UniProtKB/Swiss-Prot annotation:
Region span, Interaction with RAB11: 334-504
Biological role stated in the UniProt entry: Downstream effector for Rab11 which regulates Rab11 intracellular membrane trafficking functions such as endocytic recycling, intracellular ciliogenesis and protein export. ATK1-mediated phosphorylation of WDR44 induces binding to Rab11 which activates endocytic recycling of transferrin receptor back to the plasma membrane. When bound to Rab11, prevents the formation of the ciliogenic Rab11-Rabin8/RAB3IP-RAB11FIP3 complex, therefore inhibiting preciliary trafficking and ciliogenesis.
In-chain residues carrying the UniProt-annotated modification N-acetylalanine: 2
The protein's assembly and partners: Interacts with the GTP-bound form of RAB11A when membrane-associated. Interacts with GRAF1/ARHGAP26 or GRAF2/ARHGAP10; the interaction connects the endoplasmic reticulum (ER) with the endosomal tubule. Interacts (via FFAT-like motif) with VAPA (via MSP domain) or VAPB (via MSP domain); the interaction connects the ER with the endosomal tubule. Does not bind to other Rab and Rho small G proteins.
Region Binding activity, annotated ranges: 2-170
Any one of the GO CC terms: endosome membrane
Organism: Bos taurus (Bovine)
UniProt name for this protein: WD repeat-containing protein 44
Post-translational modifications: Phosphorylated by ATK1; the phosphorylation stabilizes its interaction with RAB11A and RAB11B.
PANTHER family linked: WD REPEAT DOMAIN 44, WD REPEAT-CONTAINING PROTEIN 44
Phosphoserine modification, residue list: 3, 50, 66, 71, 81, 96, 126, 261, 341, 343, 402, 469-471, 560, 564
Biological processes annotated in GO: cytosolic ciliogenesis; negative regulation of cilium assembly; regulation of vesicle-mediated transport
Residue numbers of Phosphotyrosine PTMs: 478
Residue stretches of biased makeup (Polar residues): 89-104
Amino acid sequence: MASESDTEEFFDAPEDVHLEGGDPIGYPGKVGISALKETENSAYKVGNESTVQELKQDVSKKIIESIIEESQKVIQLEDDSLDSKGKGQSDQATASPVTAGTELSNIPGLLAIDQVLQEDSQKAESQDVSEETELESKQCFPSDDTCEKPVDETTKLTEISSTAQLNVPETVTEVLNKEEVEVKESDVLESASSHSLSTKDFAVVEEVAPAKPPRQLTPEPDIVASTKKPVPARPPPPANFPPPRPPPPSRPAPPPRKKKSELEFEALKTPDLDVPKENITSDTLLTTNMASESTVKDSQPSLDLASATSGDKIVTAQENGKAPDGQTIAGEVMGPQRPRSNSGRELTDEEILASVMIKNLDTGEEIPLSLAEEKLPTGINPLTLHIMRRTKEYVSNDAAQSDDEEKLQSQQTDTDGGRLKQKTTQLKKFLGKSVKRAKHLAEEYGERAVNKVKSVRDEVFHTDQDDPSSSDDEGMPYTRPVKFKAAHGFKGPYDFDQIKVVQDLSGEHMGAVWTMKFSHCGRLLASAGQDNVVRIWALKNAFDYFNNMRMKYNTEGRVSPSPSQESLNSSKSDTDTGVCSGTDEDPDDKNAPFRQRPFCKYKGHTADLLDLSWSKNYFLLSSSMDKTVRLWHISRRECLCCFQHIDFVTAIAFHPRDDRYFLSGSLDGKLRLWNIPDKKVALWNEVDGQTKLITAANFCQNGKYAVIGTYDGRCIFYDTEHLKYHTQIHVRSTRGRNKVGRKITGIEPLPGENKILVTSNDSRIRLYDLRDLSLSMKYKGYVNSSSQIKASFSHDFNYLVSGSEDKYVYIWSTYHDLSKFTSVRRDRNDFWEGIKAHNAVVTSAIFAPNPSLMLSLDVQSEKSEGNEKGEDAEVLETMPSGIMKTDNTEVLLSADFTGAIKVFINKRKNLS
């Protein structure tokens, strides 16, 4: 709206100048005058009789009489020549009175007097005035040639009228001159007239006629003629106009008005957003004093416990009650209301579910939502955010199909009659040359049989999944080496063919693990999923440090406010875990990097957890399908704050430079930037389009832009400062079945190269260059058709890893090794390496950000027991985690649909 008002003011300015400058000069040179215009002018003169009387009192009678005598002499000389012409002109006007005709006959004589008296002044000012006239006519008005009518007998009249008009800008510019003040008074009368002749000429005609008392304006032409003579100064009349303004210069468009929420966010944006990364290293552990006291001085650009625990503990997503364009939202702030019947009675839950119809797109059948749980495949969440939840039949079928495809590929490369393989499997078991292949097939079919039995068992005895003993079945695959495979046509050398499983963290999660995230230092692992509980796993060499931090808060009176009942339950589980974790460790398993039991468990969510995010000082955010985001801290046992949303919260991310702010994406189509200390939404925006479901969100370019992924395959970028739309990428293929965008499941930035990694449900991973939004690389080979699986980079960004629906963990090189591949497309990467260590869908797979912390743990543990806690940790953190390339070692973690978590260590061969 601001831009429109500015535009109106710009176009109004020339009109103001036009009115103030004098006559609108569409008609400066016309001689033919209509009687109607003359009548209007005379009426205007009568209305201004008081003004003329004042002028008559100020002029001496001698000057008046002398000028009248001279005018009568000139009239007698030129009366005969111009009398006929004046009458002819008056006859042409319609409805002209007789008095007007007589006055018009005297116009040339009076104007001739004006010309004689002003002849001297015209000679001195002719050059300046002509230049001003040309400039004024070019700037504000059209050309005089287009509107003038050439009349031979009125040449003098034209010159005098033009001279009278030329005096207008002269008198305006010289405001301080006493003589010019009187001319300005006449300009007032001239600006009010819209006739072809100047107003001063009309005044002369009217003042000559003595028969009409209202028109006794004879002094006016004398005053005009005597403007060059010194007259006593007098104040200007009140009707005087200000001098004309020049046309306004073109000015740039004003910046858009900022909303109140944006101004508040900018006010909160202290220079800490620009603090370099070196000032706060994410790899060094916070000291005990920093974590316990939480002083603002030590962590000014970061979130501290004092601000996190202050204010409301439950925050609603009101977005300050304003829409992106500043309009107030009334219905959304009030929240959804329960529908009512025609009589006004509130509907029950059963009635609401029965009124909503669900259509099965495969069969076309429509059923009420109340029966959807029984009719539709179980395990699918309402908005397809993740894969099957309770039964594994659909997953098993997909896995079997992928296994059959894998066997078909091996059959094509086999030279021993691959097509007869299925018919002669039992016979080949007895053949010496096929013993290895027979064992492989038996292993494949055995695993599928076990999976089928497990799926049936889980359906019939679903509650038995909560029994920790059920995880013992998962130990069967680890009695033999990890299965490795590579892409067809990828002949090696391989980087992960020697990978080994060093730890199995199964038995804790009761259901699928949907997300896993490492802390910035690499010593803590957070995992969450279907059982609504967040679990924190700590490295063995860092357990004592974090345990002391937690115990310090427990013994110092619990600085946090009174915990809720859910917090008390969480505290109880944390305390029990802390006591038992020190005694339940397996002393024989020295290669296991993590303690076998979680460091703590956070309970409070009432539905599946979908995403996690760590801050650099051990704050943790968790988002859930219960429409909330909860804030935790590693030293506290209760939830610090709960941020309520309107729909499922699919993605969250701390701001990389200022973790007082975090980003949340929800299925209501809104992207929110939350201010944790103020407990409110600082900025927000809404996705456009038919499909407004946000399924992924993250920051890129070190927090400069916020990126979200949608259900229809769009990556939309917003500038973080104002959360305004910047650009977008439609993630899809140019042709084929993937030409329609599919759900975005993950967005990961590639630091240092201005690129992002996008995972989608078309079983493709794409690397985009943000400089021109071009596709740098496309990775394929894994299966991701309906899950919330996302890919991520290794600690040195040389590799990327992803889970898969076919039970494998897939690894790609970020860029092609030209020494291995000579004739391949530079923007396609089909050369993957696969690892199979799970019997279910691999829902999450990540690299450890600091693998050196997990190597030689037996030596590090001995040093940590003999020295002070934290000294050895600080030595290990002297180098940033992103540049550790000295040892070619990777630590990989993967989680599956059953809740099992596996830890792998891979030592690559020395690079040449």
